[in-house]
């Protein structure tokens, strides 16, 4: 793992509604590189194609010489809480293996976190297997009980598959 900062890195936000097939292909390639499990590949392809219908999703892409090396998606998604409705979800955060440790993930996530506070982007709520990374950027773990309103058969089932659910900013109460 190289420690330092990736050179010639270009970070851009693209509205999902206008993502080209070429860029989407790069996103799918990076998702599969990050999560290579066979069963998960098929599920990820389906989810990626299904997400194409979501006109309010944005993709933050980190490029080096026209190669996608980092990615995150975010979208306004309403979540009802005891204190009212909050909105924003972060998903599909990944960095290609040889660029890990070079500030690519940090730059992508800082770009997304900078959007918090904009209309319909109250907080960033997400799941992760690497909570320490996000804690350094101002997020914290939450232990709230979640009810999955889209799962009519078992709404009490945990809607998250990763162990840690986090929220940004860490001051959100």
Short names for language-model regions:
Residues 1-25:
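Conserved N-terminal entry element of GNAT/NAT acetyltransferase domains
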Residues 90-101, 129:
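A short, internal acetyl-CoA/4′-phosphopantetheine-binding micro-motif in the GNAT/acyltransferase core
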Residues 95, 101-114:
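Conserved acetyl-CoA-binding loop-helix of GNAT-fold acetyltransferases
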């Amino acid at each position: 793992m190289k420690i330092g900062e990736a050179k010639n890195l270009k970070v851009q936000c693209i509205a999902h509604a206008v993502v080209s097939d070429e860029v989407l292909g790069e996103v799918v390639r990076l998702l599969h590189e990050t999560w290579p499990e066979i069963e998960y590949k098929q599920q990820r392809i389906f989810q990626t194609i299904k997400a194409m219908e979501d006109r309010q999703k944005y993709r933050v892409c980190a490029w080096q010489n026209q190669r996608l090396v980092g990615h995150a998606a975010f979208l306004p998604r309403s979540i009802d809480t005891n204190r009212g409705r909050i909105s924003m979800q972060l998903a599909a955060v990944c960095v290609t293996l040889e660029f890990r440790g070079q500030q690519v993930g940090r730059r992508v996530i800082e770009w997304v976190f900078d959007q918090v506070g904009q209309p319909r982007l109250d907080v960033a709520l997400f799941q992760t297997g690497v909570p320490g990374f996000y804690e350094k950027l101002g997020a914290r773990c939450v232990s709230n009980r979640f009810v999955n309103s889209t799962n009519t058969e078992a709404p009490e089932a945990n809607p998250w598959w990763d162990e840690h659910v986090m929220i940004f900013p860490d001051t959100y109460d």
